[in-house]
């Protein structure tokens, strides 16, 4: 479990053969203790869940405790985020994640990677968030097209126990595809692995750090099998010189990276059990699932230029499991001892929580069963949540059928009362409902391309009033509203502005003569549909195998 720190990145390319030794400030033969703490994919969860799980108040208590422990042992701590602070919880979204960034300040984050969901808002909002934050937003591979300059700091330098640590930030280049294209007219996302090679060389030539760490928002894919996603941390680690990074603190795929065997993650990691991080090409790769459910802790010993990992764990933040007792009653119980919430953090966050609560908790309707919007479903199969959303868009636009990315569905709605908060958790991005009138031939071409979007990615399509069989890149038995598509007939398709402008790699339709931007926000359209059609019958929206991939 060792990393040999070298003066440069070990001949990154043939042109990188020149080496330089770091300017050592550490003492020879002395062992230094360095602890790296990490989270990722926070997605607006500044407050505890309805079951009392996670939240920044408990996270602060945990981090403060670890800092105290490490300090007593003479060590130093670095706290990093793998990005995606934005989007997911209405109380946060309505306030541009101000409570989240202010809470992270109070915890003492040192740096964060810029995630793709940081671009769910215009750049002006992101710049305001940088002002709120007392830590740097890092990304070496995001550039402004018009100037050729980076939009964010590529790295930050920290000193812990006389050890000079460089932290590089990198962002998935899928952002341009899966983000809102309207916000990227002057932004370029370069290949992060290629940019990493350049930055490592620059650091070793100029800054001469003792240790280099990357905080990334790129995703962890077993054995580098990234499918239709952009390459992630595993692929990058393999492309770099061995051991050129001590560690990659990741995000984006929202997994607990706990390996069951070489190149294979545990399928159902149990909170509080041992977690073995991934190691590729001499580089450790870690990720702490999502939402602040865990704080990852990596304890290293640094001696004579070598970094040795001596302990790693994912620490659950008040995570609970549902237990059913012999009497038939059930309750949620903690996996690990409860972590108290920090009073100072509660004092900071309570006004933010209360600010949006009144409007969000108003009942707008009800449903008699689960509307399935879980990430593990909407990116793989057709769901009734997708059908409800598309039914709302079809009703508003008078469309014949509807299409949207499964990744745009962010939550389920449980049986019972539905609030506006529930709707905003399902559709938090503020996309506009649009439609396009297309010939039958154009419909065939469009759906043929959309049907190539693979499961296990946000691009996987949710469809309504459409049936087909997809095989080897072609569609057969294609029907709209149960009738075969007539090439000469005109059809109206409802979708979202995100997909219409090329988001998730969908065909652009905003340049078609029959394209109309309705101006209606997707969550508002869904809210009104629920109000007008409650109580909803969940079973009535259940997919019946209309579309299949062979």
From Swiss-Prot:
Residue numbers binding Zn(2+) 2: 84, 116, 217, 252
Recorded catalytic activity of this chain's protein: UDP-sugar + H2O = UMP + alpha-D-aldose 1-phosphate; a ribonucleoside 5'-phosphate + H2O = a ribonucleoside + phosphate
Entry EC no(s): 3.6.1.45, 3.1.3.5
Top-tier EC class: hydrolase
GO CC annotations, alphabetized: outer membrane-bounded periplasmic space
Localization per Swiss-Prot or TrEMBL: Periplasm
Function as written in the Swiss-Prot or TrEMBL entry: Degradation of external UDP-glucose to uridine monophosphate and glucose-1-phosphate, which can then be used by the cell.
Quaternary context: Monomer.
Protein known as: Protein UshA
Organism from which the protein derives: Salmonella pullorum
């Amino acid at each position: 479990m060792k990393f040999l720190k070298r003066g440069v990145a070990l001949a990154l390319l043939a042109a990188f053969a020149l080496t330089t030794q770091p300017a050592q400030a550490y003492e020879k033969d002395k062992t230094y203790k360095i602890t790296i703490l990490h989270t990722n994919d926070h997605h607006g969860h500044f407050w505890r869940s309805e079951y009392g799980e996670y939240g920044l108040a408990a996270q602060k208590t945990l981090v403060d405790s670890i800092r105290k422990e490490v300090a007593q042992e003479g060590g130093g701590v670095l706290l990093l985020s793998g990005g995606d602070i934005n989007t997911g919880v209405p109380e946060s979204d309505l306030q541009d994640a101000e409570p989240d960034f202010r809470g992270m300040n109070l915890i003492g984050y040192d740096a964060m990677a810029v995630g793709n969901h940081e671009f769910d808002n215009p750049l002006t909002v992101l710049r305001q968030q940088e002002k709120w934050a007392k830590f740097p937003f890092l990304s070496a591979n995001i550039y402004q097209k018009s100037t050729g300059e980076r939009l964010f700091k590529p790295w930050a330098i920290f000193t812990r126990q006389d050890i000079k640590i460089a932290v590089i930030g990198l962002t998935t280049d899928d952002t341009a595809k899966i983000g809102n294209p309207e916000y990227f007219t002057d932004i370029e996302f370069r290949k992060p692995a290629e940019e990493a090679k350049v930055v490592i060389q620059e650091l070793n030539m100029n800054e001469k750090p003792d240790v280099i760490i990357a905080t990334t928002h790129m995703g962890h894919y077993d054995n580098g099998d990234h499918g239709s996603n952009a390459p992630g941390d595993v692929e990058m680690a393999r492309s770099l010189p061995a051991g050129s990074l001590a560690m990659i603190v990741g995000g984006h795929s929202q997994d607990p990276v706990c390996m069951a065997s070489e190149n294979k993650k545990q399928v159902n990691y149990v909170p509080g059990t041992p977690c073995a991080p991934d190691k590729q090409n001499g580089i450790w790769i870690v990720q702490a699932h999502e939402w602040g459910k865990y704080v990852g802790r990596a304890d290293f010993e640094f001696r004579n230029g070598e970094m040795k990992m001596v302990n790693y764990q994912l620490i659950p933040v008040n995570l609970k499991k549902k237990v059913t007792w012999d009497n038939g009653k059930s309750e949620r119980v903690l996996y690990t001892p409860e972590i108290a919430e920090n009073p100072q953090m509660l004092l900071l966050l309570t006004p933010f929580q209360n600010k949006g609560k009144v409007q969000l908790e108003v009942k707008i309707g009800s449903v008699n069963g689960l509307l399935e919007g879980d990430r593990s479903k909407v990116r793989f199969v057709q769901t009734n949540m997708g059908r409800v959303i598309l039914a709302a868009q079809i009703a508003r636009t008078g469309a014949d059928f509807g299409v949207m990315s499964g990744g745009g569905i962010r939550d389920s709605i449980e049986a019972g009362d539905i609030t506006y908060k529930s709707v905003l958790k399902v559709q938090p991005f503020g996309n506009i409902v649009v439609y396009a009138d297309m010939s039958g031939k154009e419909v065939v071409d469009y759906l043929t391309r959309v049907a190539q979007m693979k499961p296990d990615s946000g691009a996987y399509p949710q469809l309504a009033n459409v049936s087909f069989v997809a095989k080897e890149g072609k569609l057969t038995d294609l029907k709209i509203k149960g009738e075969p598509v007539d090439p000469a007939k005109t059809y109206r398709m409802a979708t979202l502005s995100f997909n219409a402008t090329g988001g998730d790699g969908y065909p652009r339709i905003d340049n078609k003569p029959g394209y109309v931007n309705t101006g209606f926000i997707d969550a508002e359209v869904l809210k009104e549909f629920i109000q007008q059609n409650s109580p909803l019958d969940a079973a009535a929206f259940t997919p019946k195998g209309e579309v299949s991939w062979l």
